[in-house]
C-alpha cells in the first residue's frame, strides 16, 4: 500500500483539496485498495475545524464529498507511517522539516514538483489566487 499525506498550513483549503481530488482520481482508476490518502496541517490554528466552505463548494461541484474531514496537525510519527509527505509550498516544506527534523528516506516533496512547472501553490486564505470562491 502506498500512503500519501498532503500537507498545508491549516488543513482546511489546499491539502484537503489535494486529498479528496487524489482520492477521487485513485478511485476512478480502480486503485483504491492500493492507496491510503490523508491530509494534515503544519500549524495548530485550524485544528478540529471542517474543510473551508469554498473548498467544500468546489469539491461538491465536482461531485466529491469531503464530509467528516476535520483539520489535524501533522506529527513527527507521520514520517514513519507515510511514504510521501507532500507540501503545497516552500513554507509548508520548511515547516514539515521543522516537525520531522530530517528526511533520510527522501519522502518530502512539494506538490507541483511532480509537474512540468514546479512552483508553489499559493495559500488562498491569504492570496485568493487559487480559487476566488473561498474569499467571497
Regions found by a protein language model. Give the residues of each.
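Conserved active-site segments centered on acidic
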Residues: 1-81
Amino acid at each position: 500500500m502506498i500512503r500519501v499525506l498532503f500537507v498545508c498550513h491549516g488543513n482546511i483549503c489546499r491539502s484537503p483539496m489535494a486529498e479528496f481530488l487524489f482520492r477521487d482520481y485513485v478511485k476512478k482508476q480502480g486503485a483504491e485498495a492500493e492507496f491510503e490518502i490523508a491530509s494534515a496541517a503544519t500549524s495548530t490554528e485550524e485544528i478540529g475545524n471542517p474543510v473551508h466552505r469554498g473548498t467544500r463548494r468546489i469539491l461538491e461541484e465536482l461531485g466529491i464529498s469531503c464530509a467528516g474531514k476535520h483539520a489535524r496537525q501533522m506529527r513527527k510519527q507521520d514520517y514513519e507511517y507515510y511514504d510521501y509527505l507532500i507540501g503545497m509550498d516552500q513554507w509548508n516544506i520548511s515547516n514539515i522539516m521543522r516537525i520531522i527534523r530530517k528526511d533520510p528516506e527522501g519522502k518530502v516533496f512539494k506538490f507541483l514538483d511532480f509537474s512540468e512547472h514546479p512552483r508553489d501553490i499559493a495559500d488562498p486564505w491569504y492570496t485568493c489566487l487559487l480559487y476566488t470562491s473561498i474569499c467571497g
